[in-house]
Amino acid sequence: MKHLLAAGFLLLAVQAAAAEPAGFRSVAISAGHHGRDMSGALWYPSSGGGEANSYGENGVFFGTRVLDGAQMAEGPFPVILASHGLGGNIGALGWLTAGLAEAGALVISVNHPNSTTRDFNLQEGLKHWTRTQDLRAALDWLAAQPDLAARADFSRVYAVGYSAGGWTALALGGLRANLWGYAARCETAPPSPWQCADLTRRGADLTAYSPEDWDAGRKDDRIRAVAAIDPALTYGVGRVHARDLVERVLLIGLGNRETRLPATDFSATGSGFVSHLPAAEIETMAPAAHFSALPACKPRGPAILAAEGDDPVCDDPPGT
């Protein structure tokens, strides 16, 4: 299924090339809006050298094969900004970012401050506009590195993201949020996992945010197309909020009606967001569930998660 997701975005953004292991570099990027640096990663077509590594591997998840420190091929390459989900990290989308790099893209991803695995504050992490600032800063950083900028094609810049990162990609493409519309949904919606009641239980307070921040446009005119996998925050969003969105949009939904996560269901039976993008390319991956977009789990992964009281992210529907 993950290969299909990568292929779907490749059709939108990248012309596939011969697949060699992706080159990889860890980078630090200044994020003045956070008052600190953020960790990032470059994934790129390699031309030799580097140390073979399984990036992001741990007791629960298998890692992603990369060549750490490999030489970068000549380019120029399209640039893709990648955004992980709330509480995720760079490695959580490693299968996708490495796959895009192997296919001929220069990909940059960051650990979003306040909303990553070991740096998490829900109230701060829900300030979705800081995530667009993160990726804008990453793109600015890339453009300021002469050796990297020479290999980048800045006429082909794209954004991709998963869950909260899916919203980040859409917002960079011009979509605007609707705080009161989202809050109204929370007042009328039945309790459902990972949505309103769960946010409140975890200590989030939607009334603490200002519409001026939540609803403001965050479009970056350098973005030519976006792909969003199970994007969050689409409740309350109407056609007026999408009027500045780039034309080339790929929406990927995970699961059928029985297995879709309500918080990220953009279908007619969910937020209905899909009806406001008549020109978008829509793909549904089933059988699947929201967490099917995470890396492949190891055999002992479910037991480790259960012992730690963590979310059952390894419990994919049969046949996934």
Labelled PLM ranges:
Residues 244-320:
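Active-site-adjacent alpha-helix of alpha/beta-hydrolase-fold enzymes
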Residues 45, 111-115, 288:
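Short beta-to-alpha linker loops that shape the active-site pocket of alpha/beta-hydrolase fold enzymes
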Residues 161-165, 169:
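Gly/Ala-rich beta-loop-alpha elbow adjacent to hydrolase catalytic centers
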Residues 19-82, 301:
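Domain-level recognition of soluble alpha/beta enzyme cores
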Residues 200-279:
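The feature captures the conserved acid-bearing segment of alpha/beta-hydrolase catalytic domains
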Residues 69-77, 82-120, 258-263:
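Short substrate-entry loop that stabilizes the transition state in hydrolases
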Residues 124-150, 171-173, 180-198, 203, ...:
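Alpha/beta-hydrolase active-site loop
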Residues 156-158, 227:
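Residue in the alpha/beta-hydrolase core beta-strand immediately N-terminal to the catalytic nucleophile
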